[in-house]
Amino acid sequence: MQITDVRVRRVSKEGKMKAVVSITLDNEFVVHDIKVIEGEKGLFIAMPSRKAGDGEYRDIAHPINSITRDKIQSIILEKYELAALEGNIEEAE
């Protein structure tokens, strides 16, 4: 699996969420609404989720192993930091 495109959109409000990202896998499948969040230990990603009836949030799509999660997170954070440095982050709606 290759991440063939990463689109970064800045979140305009103040807070821990810094951006919303979409990734394309193998030029065939897109995952929207991956969040870049500032945590106590630095930036991390949160996969798209939905609030369940019990009030808990459940991921809609997510990697099934830590190697894939680390790969996706590394690429997204690299693209986010590069876009932030270059000023190439579009505003999220």
UniProtKB/Swiss-Prot annotation:
It comes from the Bacteria. It holds the Pfam family SpoVG. Transmembrane segments: none annotated. The keyword Mitochondrion does not apply. Keywords: Cell cycle, Cell division, Septation. SUPFAM superfamilies: SpoVG-like. The keyword Cell division applies. Gene3D superfamilies: Stage V sporulation protein G. One of its GO terms (biological process) is division septum assembly. Could be involved in septation. Belongs to the SpoVG family. This is Putative septation protein SpoVG.
